[in-house]
Curated annotation (Swiss-Prot):
<dbReference type="InterPro" id="IPR049961">
    <property type="entry name" value="ThiI_N"/>
</dbReference>
<dbReference type="InterPro" id="IPR003720">
    <property type="entry name" value="tRNA_STrfase"/>
</dbReference>
<feature type="binding site">
    <location>
        <begin position="208"/>
        <end position="209"/>
    </location>
    <ligand>
        <name>ATP</name>
    </ligand>
</feature>
<keyword id="KW-0067">ATP-binding</keyword>
<dbReference type="GO" id="GO:0004810">
    <property type="term" value="F:CCA tRNA nucleotidyltransferase activity"/>
</dbReference>
<keyword id="KW-0820">tRNA-binding</keyword>
<feature type="binding site">
    <location>
        <position position="287"/>
    </location>
    <ligand>
        <name>ATP</name>
    </ligand>
</feature>
<keyword id="KW-0694">RNA-binding</keyword>
<comment type="pathway">
    <text>Cofactor biosynthesis; thiamine diphosphate biosynthesis.</text>
</comment>
<dbReference type="InterPro" id="IPR050102">
    <property type="entry name" value="tRNA_sulfurtransferase_ThiI"/>
</dbReference>
<dbReference type="GO" id="GO:0000049">
    <property type="term" value="F:tRNA binding"/>
</dbReference>
<dbReference type="GO" id="GO:0005524">
    <property type="term" value="F:ATP binding"/>
</dbReference>
<keyword id="KW-0547">Nucleotide-binding</keyword>
<keyword id="KW-0784">Thiamine biosynthesis</keyword>
<keyword id="KW-0963">Cytoplasm</keyword>
<feature type="domain" description="THUMP">
    <location>
        <begin position="60"/>
        <end position="165"/>
    </location>
</feature>
<feature type="binding site">
    <location>
        <begin position="183"/>
        <end position="184"/>
    </location>
    <ligand>
        <name>ATP</name>
    </ligand>
</feature>
Amino acid sequence: MDYSEIMVRHGELSTKGKNRMRFINKLKNNIQDVLAPFPAITVRSDRDRTHVSLNGTDYQPIVEALKLVFGVQALSPVYKLEKSVPLLVTAVQDIMTSLYRDGLTFKIATKRSDHAFELDSRELNSLLGGAVFEVLPNIQAQMKHPDVTLKVEIRDEAAYISYEEIKGAGGLPVGTSGKGMLMLSGGIDSPVAGYLALKRGLDIEVVHFASPPYTSPGALAKAQDLTRRLTRFGGNIQFIEVPFTEIQEEIKNKAPEAYLMTLTRRFMMRITDAIREQRKGLVIVNGESLGQVASQTLESMQAINAVTSTPIIRPVVTMDKLEIIEMAQAIDTFDISIQPFEDCCTIFAPDRPKTNPKLSNAEKYEERFDIDGLVQRAVSGIVVTEITPEIVNDEVENLIDALL
């Protein structure tokens, strides 16, 4: 027998009361986005399950994709069949025969939500267990810790049989907690910050600053590839490329070297906040980790934050670098992040950046710039690209390989 579908059990959604169906529908949409590379798949949701019909598609890549989607508590490959006792008997016998090995123990666990069905749960357990013994007389039943628990669900629309439960990613469906702008440089930390924000249901749009010719097409492709990795956890992501060359050249020419990083970050924050307001976001997310680099001391954060009253979420702020690296490896962004392309934060980095910049000094140096004009020109020049889980071709990988 081939699996008919993957049955998805919802995570924290069970606690969402009147908003439950809104959360479930969002999860359904996210699953459809993530499974877009598999055109035969269909997705249907009810109040306590989401059903991913395979329609002949190999179940293993579908399981691997679904395991990453936030809002999924657990999933099981299942056999779906008509609510017929003879069909159930035959299916249970076939499944257990295919799984049998010497010494195997099993139990039947039936759940009946369709109370109009002809047998109750106890009667089904007895009948189906007896059917297994008919074809496998040497198999042993074990109620407490069996090798195989064959779960049979009798629901209104059909019967479902499964024996494997796979842990999902948990968390909340992406998009159920509002929208935020993720400042993604291309390093190790910001993709991890994005992953953690996605886990709590935040719909992120990626903001990436590009300064050609100082930053290369490879750096841009790298940032887009990191974004594509993040789409596996909740579906499509808008990638916003910000032209930053003019601002960086202005800062380089007019500001003291020690304040280059502080002023650069202040402009980035202003621009990100302007984009957030334009695109109706609620928060800004970044990958700052306290004390990791000069721009991430409390004094630096305070001087940089002063340009906005928008909440700044820093998911990795208390994590050690090794912890961040381990998480980056786990979510498959680390190998991309360490590709040797310079980003906007490194091309004009001073040898001795100020670790305790004074806000008054930063504001004094910024009097040398047309702040509003620079920000407005950057925001008006953004390029927005929708990044999807589906890789249409290998252009990104080929470009990176050619530039390395």
